[in-house]
Amino acid sequence: MDESGGDSGSVATPVQQRAHEAWRIYQHYLDKTTPHANYRWIGTLVVALIYCLRVYYIQGFYIIAYGLGIYLLNLLIGFLSPLVDPEAGGVSDGPSLPTRGSDEFKPFIRRLPEFKFWYSMTKAFCIAFLMTFFSVFDVPVFWPILLCYWIVLFVLTMRRQIAHMIKYKYIPFSFGKQKYGGRSSSGSRAD
């Protein structure tokens, strides 16, 4: 007889229950960081600095650093790109950017939101840091060639992205709500 008294397929093992509970706690703390963008980015900079110091002091794992750089460049392009690309044509699932002066204003919606950009970047630095503890990933390469190639790739990619921004007249950065300098009232308002 079945002692569980129900469907045995729905009963989770203690390991699965612990894993689910750990995931819920992790997600809770991750959700609590959402409104604190400055602190999140400071934490990511600290993680990036620790990773850079590790690579510098052990004098290796340059191929991991190169792969990380390519991945971060890909994330940056996603962060700077609009959700709906005006070059893609007429098919549009959501709001698009205005291309003519007569078009109505449509807000800039990123292809990769800031939180996902931060989370992916931080996760990438952590994974790259962990990879530096395994010698199998320490492929001997001449790092100046990788650095030069990455710089050329970065310059060409950003030139294309900036040309796209100029062509379609969008700016992917906003610094909060726009404030207008209205005239100051010299007297008090009568209610």
Swiss-Prot record:
Alphabetical list of Pfam families matching this protein: Rer1
Xref: InterPro entries: Rer1 (IPR004932)
Source organism: Arabidopsis thaliana (Mouse-ear cress)
Statement: the UniProt record of this protein carries the keyword Transmembrane: yes
Name the UniProt record assigns to this protein: Protein RER1A
Membrane topology: Multi-pass membrane protein
GO biological processes: retrograde vesicle-mediated transport, Golgi to endoplasmic reticulum
Summary of the function given for this chain in its UniProt record: Involved in the retrieval of endoplasmic reticulum membrane proteins from the early Golgi compartment.
Similarity remark: Belongs to the RER1 family.
Chain segments annotated as transmembrane: 39-57, 60-80, 115-135, 136-156
Cellular component GO terms, alphabetical: Golgi apparatus; membrane
N-acetylmethionine modifications at: M1
